[in-house]
Amino acid sequence: MLENIPTQEELNELLGAKVFEVWECIVNYINETYVMETLWDIGRKAGKYEMKFRKGGKTLCTLYAREGNFGFMIIYGKSEREKFENKRSLFSEKIQAYYDDAKTYHDGKWIMIDIFDFAHVEDIKNMLE
């Protein structure tokens, strides 16, 4: 857990103004849609910082702040994979490729999406449903 959570200014500087807008859009969507606990930590290999959204010990998703972009990580268990497959055609080809290329572990399919702009925001909202 981070002792000092990065400020909006620090995130804006790290991500860049355009990418920071996307970050804020996704964070605001999650906060408006779900009641979640937010946990900050160092991002290790995935980014400088990680912002994890959790409820009752279960993680909804994690954002990894990086220089000029960020990663959006979601882990799909069996039921979430079935939901994705049932509405697969609603997702862009790029998101389908991220899904297909993601590794499946004992606890689910770990999908990491690199975010540089608003291109995947609607897909991400659909992935969170």
Segments (PLM) and residue ranges:
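Short, conserved beta-strand/beta-arch hydrophobic-aromatic motifs that form part
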Residues: 43-103
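Short, solvent-exposed coil/turn linker segments
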Residues: 7-10, 77, 104, 114
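Well-ordered alpha/beta subsegment
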Residues: 94-129
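Short, Lys/Arg-enriched charge-dense amphipathic segments
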Residues: 1-2, 58-73, 112-115, 127-129
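Generic recognition of short, well-ordered alpha-helical interface segments
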Residues: 18-21, 25, 67, 119, ...
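Charge-rich, low-complexity N-terminal segments
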Residues: 1-46
